[in-house]
Amino acid sequence: MIKEYYGAETFILNKDFAYILVIGTTDVSLIPGLTIAGATPELTHFTPAADAEYVLLGKCKSINTIPVSPTGIPTPALLTRASLSFINPLKIVVNAGSRILPKIPYIDLQGEPGKDIRKQALSMEKVNNIIENSIKLGEELSNEYELIMIGESIPAGTTTAMATLLALGYDAMDKVSSASPDNPKELKRKVVEEALRNLPTDPLQRLAKVSDPVLLGVAGTSLGFKGKILLAGGTQMTAAAAIINEFDKNKLKDITIGTTKWIVEDKFADMLSLAKQVGVKVLASMLDLSISAYEGIRAYEKGYVKEGVGAGGSAIMALVKGVSNNTLVRKIDELYGELVGSSNLHI
């Protein structure tokens, strides 16, 4: 049910944990054709806030239904909420820089929304704010927990992740995943190549140029935390791990990426080679959604969405606690059925 890579072990997860969801936006998501993490490019800026609201409340306030792809595939926040319902951990939403603010309690890192990486993603002032404040958050969480799981929500985050990995010297071109089964590699490559022109030499200034607020918030929280960390995400979390490694070469021994089988088996990406380059362990949930009653859920098995909002890590935590695949899928269907019954969501 859970596959282990590069020395990852599930036994470290048998303890109470807090779920941290870091949200933010990047104007890269406004580039047509780059991401399907929203029904239209403009709606992608609502996705992180709506994801956070749904995970905490079971409904969205910023938009009238959960985020969906242009073809109606539901957000992975649905999988996250279903998995966490069996465990009920403390859930904390952290705003690293979201254009739309969630209508729920959250911690603000005093960052800013990411701009177009082809010009300049973030100001140095906001980069420092995000890193310093997230390090402090991680330190405070260490007083109560030995384990935290960090998820992310930022449409177009795989593009900024690829730019970040390349800017830090990794072989990442065309290796990151996509929420679409048709990974828009040529468009991503064109955007990233333009972003990487005339890079500064200082690593922090490079991150300010081509990264995004969420990657910095995830990295900072991890750097401040003293215990074990499950980075719940796909190829984006390899970029977060690369940033962590840039600051502290010893930190990755306490960190594992927890993702989905749809990421590690993605034929149009190579997440495992990225993890190996960075030097971070990987766990993958082998959750099978083909038995779902809903086409929108079964679409995950066809390469749609794949990961996000901590879906893979949350499924791993539920499976570690003894929840069966069938039980988890029934819960996902139950939550999706409630949404279909109360809105114009397509099935």
From Swiss-Prot:
GO terms for molecular function: nicotinate-nucleotide-dimethylbenzimidazole phosphoribosyltransferase activity. InterPro entries: Nict_dMeBzImd_PRibTrfase, Nict_dMeBzImd_PRibTrfase_arc, Nict_dMeBzImd_PRibTrfase_sf. It holds the Pfam family DBI_PRT. Belongs to the UPF0284 family. NCBIfam families: nicotinate mononucleotide-dependent phosphoribosyltransferase CobT (TIGR00303), PRK04447.1-1 (NF003368), PRK04447.1-3 (NF003370), PRK04447.1-5 (NF003372). This is UPF0284 protein M1425_0030. It comes from Saccharolobus islandicus (strain M.14.25 / Kamchatka #1) (Sulfolobus islandicus).
